[in-house]
């Protein structure tokens, strides 16, 4: 029994009680349900946080955690065992990504390295200060002093192939292609959608923009983010007020832990924001956007909200196709 591990899914109420620690692993997309996995030696830590809970054992049986003890039940369905295999693959992929970053940091200096040319030129960026490296694509305008659009992808496009983020942002190109502008598409390393790794990635995006090999208008930098990218967009304008001319976070959120009092919402006042979300989104809940919008309206900020009640965590495509977010962004400029 010493190798027996348990798995269960919990929602954000659990995350409010216990921040992510080594024994709590996140396997779902973005910030909705959290996948936690732990072994018997960690039960004392877990049982104080959960009441009666159904656990899935690595031996193929269901267990019930009740009043501090675990009771073995019947066999698990095949779908649950499949989820276990997914979890193992997830961890291996995460470990490989961490090892890749470590190798890159040890062999590369700070800054930008061009990999290939073309319409969307491929680059690699190494940030020794924040201990991260990642690829990005840049479509530079032929003209000087044009605006810069930063497109931040969802969690599904994380990796190091420098391709997934292109496909993830396809609905946005169809709008931006009509505009003479610079387009930056960073690709977040696998596993950088939480904790310190996420903060390092966010800070590195700002450093990358400062060092970009493109002559663009620094008073017209616009940040567009989808899902995980929407969360990053909120964080960027919170950490660096008066740097971005406007932000469009879609299906994202700033206060995902719902500890609203620790956030100084006034930091967002000087950045025009168009937040888009769906009330039936179960991956990234709308609570944070609702809270930030209400507080920013009280402060007289330039805040616009698109709040739908259907489409769930798939509303971004329709939003980008049907709303005039491009024109709205271009109407904003830093003073």
Tell where the protein language model's regions lie, with residue ranges.
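Primarily recognizes the serine-hydrolase "nucleophile elbow" in alpha/beta-hydrolase
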Residues: 219-266
């Amino acid at each position: 029994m010493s190798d027996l591990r348990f798995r269960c899914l919990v929602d954000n109420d659990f995350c409010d009680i216990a921040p992510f620690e080594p024994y709590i692993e996140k396997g779902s997309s973005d910030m909705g349900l959290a996948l936690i996995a732990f072994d018997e030696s960690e039960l004392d830590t877990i049982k104080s946080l959960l009441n009666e809970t159904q656990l899935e054992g690595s031996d193929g049986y269901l267990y019930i955690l009740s009043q501090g003890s675990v009771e073995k039940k019947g066999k698990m369905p095949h779908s649950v065992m499949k989820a276990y295999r997914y979890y193992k693959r997830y961890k291996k992929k995460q470990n490989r990504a961490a090892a890749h970053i470590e190798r890159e940091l040890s062999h590369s200096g700070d800054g930008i390295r061009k990999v290939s040319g073309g319409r969307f030129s491929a680059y690699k960026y190494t940030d020794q200060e924040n201990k991260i490296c990642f690829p990005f694509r840049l479509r530079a305008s032929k003209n000087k002093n044009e605006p810069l659009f930063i497109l931040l992808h969802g969690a599904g496009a994380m990796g190091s192939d420098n391709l997934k983020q292109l496909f993830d942002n396809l609905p946005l190109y169809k709008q931006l292609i009509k505009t003479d502008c610079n387009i930056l598409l960073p690709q977040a390393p696998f596993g950088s959608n939480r904790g310190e790794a996420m903060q390092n990635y966010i800070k590195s995006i700002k450093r990358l923009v400062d060092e970009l090999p493109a002559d663009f208008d620094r008073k017209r930098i616009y940040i567009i983010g989808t899902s995980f990218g929407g969360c990053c967009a909120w964080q960027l304008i919170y950490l660096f007020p008066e740097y971005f001319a406007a932000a469009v976070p879609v299906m994202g959120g700033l206060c995902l832990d719902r500890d609203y009092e620790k956030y100084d919402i006034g930091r967002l006042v000087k950045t025009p924001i168009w937040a888009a979300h769906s009330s039936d989104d179960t991956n990234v809940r709308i609570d944070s956007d609702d809270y930030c919008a209400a507080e920013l309206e009280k402060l007289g900020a330039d805040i616009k909200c698109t709040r739908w009640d259907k489409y769930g965590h798939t509303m971004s495509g329709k939003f980008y196709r049907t709303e005039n977010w491009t024109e709205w962004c271009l109407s904003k400029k830093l003073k």
